[in-house]
Amino acid sequence: MKNPSLRQKLEAYYRLTRLDKPIGILLLLWPTLWGIWLASPGWPDGLVLFVFIAGTVLMRSAGCVMNDLADRNFDGHVERTRQRPLVTGDVTTKEAVLLALALSLVAFILVLQLNPLVVALSFPALFLAASYPLTKRFLSIPQAYLGIAFGFGIPMAFAAITGQLPLEAWILLLANVFWAIAYDTEYAMVDRNDDLNIGIRSSAIFFGRLDVFAVMACYGAFLILMAWVGVRLQQSWPYFAGLGVAALVALYHYALIRDRDRQSCFKAFLHNNWLGAAIFVGVLASDYFRSSILSI
């Protein structure tokens, strides 16, 4: 872009950080909120909530910039990504690097308000976010790595609330890995032909004709692990009701993706926001129900 105005430049940064597409923030935020509430004996501390919500927005935005930096030589060959700011020249490589660094720095300053264990965990969290885009070059299922990166707020949440990393935090993280493989395979089914042409790896390519089966199997593993967490943490019936609603949402996704229509697969991917929300409502309701019983 030649001599862009301030408004045009800010709009380009807005698109680069995907703030115009909040689904990524929500898919990152829901597991973090599950972790915060499941780790808390009651309503979580306000500072912890603020740091994690703001940090989620900042690091998801930074991750999008890092992703586009890594993929800038590929995105022009993919129909869905050829208008990204780094491809069109609306944002320079130097500007993108500085933006990613600035966002990460602000997120780190927020983390410094919490305990030393959370601060220590922020370093592998940053590494996961920065390295994920490169895994599409050599991992057959980079979506599994994405699940770890997107779910790392879970052990950080337990560390912030309890000062420890109990087994439940890691089970919840593993559950999130299966969920991420499920929803990001739906996403990858949209780009499969383009990814094959440019040599990018994805779970949709790896699973091939078994892609739909793999997605549903991952949903199943995710829900089983979430139920295990609920049993271990002695959650009340609304938690498991939330899992039941999530299972119905997953079945709806099967109806969307079984014919492998690109638009329907993308719709299923976006719809995972409601699956995450259903579980969070179940977590909140379970906490309220248990508090009501204890107060009697």
From Swiss-Prot:
Q: What is its EC number?
A: 2.5.1.39
> According to the lineage, what is the superkingdom?
Bacteria
Report a single Gene Ontology molecular function. 4-hydroxybenzoate polyprenyltransferase activity
Q: Source species, please?
A: Methylobacillus flagellatus (strain ATCC 51484 / DSM 6875 / VKM B-1610 / KT)
Q: Where are the transmembrane segments?
A: 23-43, 46-66, 99-119, 141-161, 163-183, 211-231, 237-257, 265-285
Q: Which key words tag this protein in UniProt?
A: Cell inner membrane, Cell membrane, Magnesium, Membrane, Transferase, Transmembrane, Transmembrane helix, Ubiquinone biosynthesis
Membership in a protein family: Belongs to the UbiA prenyltransferase family.
Quote the cellular component terms of the Gene Ontology held in the record: plasma membrane
**Is the GTP-binding keyword given for this protein?**
no
Q: Which NCBIfam families match?
A: ubiA_proteo
Tell me which Pfam families the record gives. Answer: UbiA
Q: Which InterPro entries match?
A: HB_polyprenyltransferase-like (IPR006370), Prenyltransferase (IPR039653), UbiA_prenyltransferase (IPR000537), UbiA_prenylTrfase_CS (IPR030470), UbiA_sf (IPR044878)
Keyword Ligase set for record: no
Q: Which GO terms describe its biological process?
A: ubiquinone biosynthetic process
The name under which this protein is listed is 4-hydroxybenzoate octaprenyltransferase
What is the annotated role of this protein in its UniProt record?
Catalyzes the prenylation of para-hydroxybenzoate (PHB) with an all-trans polyprenyl group. Mediates the second step in the final reaction sequence of ubiquinone-8 (UQ-8) biosynthesis, which is the condensation of the polyisoprenoid side chain with PHB, generating the first membrane-bound Q intermediate 3-octaprenyl-4-hydroxybenzoate.
The protein's required cofactor(s) are namely:
Mg(2+)
The annotated topology with respect to the bilayer is: Multi-pass membrane protein
| Subcellular localization(s) per the UniProt record | Cell inner membrane
